[in-house]
């Protein structure tokens, strides 16, 4: 508990304190700048030359389909597929022939299946049946093939028993073989067993795979070099955007004005970069980074520091969405309110109106109001002692987890759709958005409920499930992990069924879910970013790849 007083906060109120650590970065990203592109026109020329070479490799006609499948997959895994979206789509459409696999070996079939399903093509898992023996069992001891099989199984949907068998078979085999494997296959397998490619942050997966591919004797030199140069060029761009975000953060001086809250602007950028890293979305990342920076300040105010009376005043001010409302909230909250309105005004002026889609700002504001309402309900749970049912808790937490909001804001920021119906559809929390939000909630609660209980919280998915169904803590946690797998299968299914209206939601839903999987894989990597999160941010945003 804390009795610290901020602004006009009441002196006689005992306040909680989550004891979040200060930023691990200090002013590093405020001043850091890559010199990779400085006075180096030759790098830009080489990049363009290599890009054309890789494009030629991709589009050249060949009867060697296994090699073309492998090349397409490597281009994507190396993180350079965004340069060749049209060419890759054309190749995948050619490969989407249900009879092709009859001529493929095990390894090629597994890669082909994952590649096509991963891009929304419907492929039956029955293609795996011909690789079973007369006893109906998978049988292969080849580590590379097992790795590809294991990766493919994570595209499964509900009811695909053959893929359930395959994941158990391949995982058991790979765990036994791992100590005997050498680089680079050992790292490929270790990475997959920890977080499979389909669930990994694509930029982080590329950073891991670039040195692995570079060590393969069969690598294509031009592709390997192109991936390294492209990574470093993109890193320089991201550093520039993060530097601007850090400057904005420092100007508002959030850390000193709100010392109880998480100071995580770099971690927020890592989150948004994981969701969409491509250069053409720089403006969108700028806006979303500010949103993901300020949203936890609000969350921590409701969850940790504010009284029920104070947060209720803030909720009312957000509902009014008027600068004049700042006079009706405690002084310490005013910097959040001012920053919040400024973010959305900037978003409207520089991104939304510039595209002639001014109606989007109403969706953006409404979804932000919605998450504040959900924080209000959670504050009421704590301050009144109310314990919601499991379903009631989950219904509210789908919103408070933030993924519906971030998916809709990312849709607006990307601006890749023309139909207003897409925003209307996403706003109803369809299965795709719901699955992403539920995965986020289960993962979050599993990693944070004990820490929250230490500061007085009693409401979480784990505790609500225990209370309602009369099970132990261990059983409830096991159920949450099972639900994560169920919702992943549902998310996979909905992405395969996407139509004109919902197709724009696929990438935001998948990528935000991937970020959560990675950010919380070893604990709450956002709140406590001193360990693996710091290392991952450094790998993506600090350290260039040696060429």
UniProtKB/Swiss-Prot annotation:
Induction field = Up-regulated by methyl jasmonate.
* Keyword tags: Magnesium, Metal-binding
Give residue numbers for sequence motif DDXXD motif.
299-303
**Entry's free-text remark on domains:** The Asp-Asp-Xaa-Xaa-Asp/Glu (DDXXD/E) motif is important for the catalytic activity, presumably through binding to Mg(2+).
Residues that coordinate or bind Mg(2+) 2? 299, 303
Which InterPro entries does the record match to this protein? Isoprenoid_synthase_dom_sf (IPR008949), Terpene_cyclase-like_1_C (IPR034741), Terpene_cyclase_plant_C1 (IPR044814), Terpene_synth_N (IPR001906), Terpene_synth_N_sf (IPR036965), Terpene_synthase-like (IPR050148), Terpene_synthase_metal-bd (IPR005630), Terpenoid_cyclase/PrenylTrfase (IPR008930)
GO MF assignments: magnesium ion binding; terpene synthase activity
Q: Which CDD domains match?
A: Terpene_cyclase_plant_C1
The residues that the entry says bind Mg(2+) 3 are 444
Query: What name goes with this protein?
Result: Inactive delta-guaiene synthase
Gene assigned in the entry = C1
Q: What else is known?
A: Site-directed mutagenesis and 3-D homology modeling suggest that the structure of the N-terminal domain is important in facilitating proper folding of the protein to form a catalytically active enzyme.
What's the reported outcome of changing residue 337 to Y? Restore guaiene synthase activity. Restore guaiene synthase activity. No effect. No effect. No effect
Q: Name one GO biological process term.
A: diterpenoid biosynthetic process
Q: Does the keyword Magnesium apply?
A: yes
| Phenotype when changing residue 110 to S | Restore guaiene synthase activity. Restore guaiene synthase activity. No effect. No effect. No effect
Record keyword Metal-binding present: yes
Q: List the disulfide bonds.
A: none
Q: What is the effect of changing residue 241 to E?
A: Restore guaiene synthase activity. Restore guaiene synthase activity. No effect. No effect. No effect
